[in-house]
Amino acid sequence: MILSDKDIKKYLEERKLVIHPIDDPQKQIQPSSVDLRLGNSFLHFKVEGRAYIDPTKDNPQDLMEIIEIEEGKPFFLRPGEFVLGTTIETVKLPDDLVARVDGRSSLGRLGIIVHATAGYVDPGFCGQITLELSNINRVPVALYPGMRICQISFYKLTSPAETPYYKKAGSKYHNQKGPTASKLNIDFCVKEDK
């Protein structure tokens, strides 16, 4: 079951669901979702001179540089470019809700993709949402910090998760702040017995 605006407001009022800050509820709360806004930090891959990325050997965090954009200034996403962005809002899900992040239609019509694959948010997650931004247009597109960039919708589980994200061993992105690079390399770390 997808939550309606009425149910979203109820979850927010009862603090079961936290989205902070929501500066303009009239604009941000939609009939069955909440619009989230673009933060001012981006992670950009430093790929010059690299033939490929090997997640079993490379630490993606070492391959990225942070770009900070001043308020009111645009970030130009070039054709074919891929960067990580973040939402301004921090989202905290209760143990009985799953969330789905999707791009806004208006940006999709400009060729902006908001997430490559990771649109699913587990019950019990808390943190800012990392956005996997790319431009499939043939011209650069200006993105402004503070603009509504994506929408998050909420699905009620049949029962609360037995092991929500914050209790799950290996929850790599819990309490993330800002754009967060891939931690896939952790999956390949082998602990040796001594």
From Swiss-Prot:
CDD domains: trimeric_dUTPase. Keywords: Hydrolase, Nucleotide metabolism, Nucleotide-binding. One of its GO terms (biological process) is nucleobase-containing small molecule interconversion. It comes from the Bacteria. The keyword Nucleotide-binding applies. The keyword Protein transport does not apply. Disulfide bonds: none annotated. Pfam families: DCD (PF22769). DCTP binds at residues 104-109, 122, 130-132, 151, 165, 172, 176. Bifunctional enzyme that catalyzes both the deamination of dCTP to dUTP and the hydrolysis of dUTP to dUMP without releasing the toxic dUTP intermediate. Homotrimer. This is dCTP deaminase, dUMP-forming.
